[in-house]
A protein has these predicted regions:
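Amphipathic alpha-helical "stalk" segments
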Residues: 6, 16, 37-48, 74, ...
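Vicinal oxygen chelate
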Residues: 5-13, 31, 57-121
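Conserved short beta-strand elements that form part of the metal-binding/catalytic scaffold
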Residues: 28-62, 108-114
């Protein structure tokens, strides 16, 4: 459903400690996602919603929320038209496409398009 929050990434300097915290707080169970350029541990909240603890990228702190879209290229273009910064769309093999963008105030967020035919790397 377009506009629904579908994923959240929580950066951490110590991913084991963060997984222990969030796992204990909410009962989340994590699986390492292979092939990621950074340490990345995924969890599921529901059939269509999930999240991840990921290695921190420099001084960046705070979660990044991803929103579902019907067409990532169309919505990515709209981000720019509305005064934000659009990002390149990348495939997640067999799952879909994502793009990291910034809103008009510089806040990062992500777009997600489900596509089981998304190509491999």
């Amino acid at each position: 459903m377009a506009g629904q929050m579908v994923h959240v990434e929580i950066p951490a300097g110590d991913t084991a400690k963060a997984r222990e915290f969030w796992g204990s707080l909410f009962g989340w169970q994590f699986e390492e996602y292979p092939g990621s350029p950074t340490e990345y541990h995924m969890t599921r909240f529901s059939e269509t919603q999930g999240g991840a603890i990921m290695g921190a990228d420099g001084d960046k702190r705070g979660p990044r929320v991803y929103f579902d879209v019907d067409d990532i290229n169309t919505e990515n273009a709209r981000v720019g038209e509305l005064g934000g910064s659009s990002g390149e769309a990348y495939p997640v093999p067999g799952m879909g496409w994502f793009a990291v963008c910034k809103d008009s105030e510089g806040n990062e967020f992500g777009l997600w398009q489900t596509d089981p035919n998304a190509p491999g790397a």
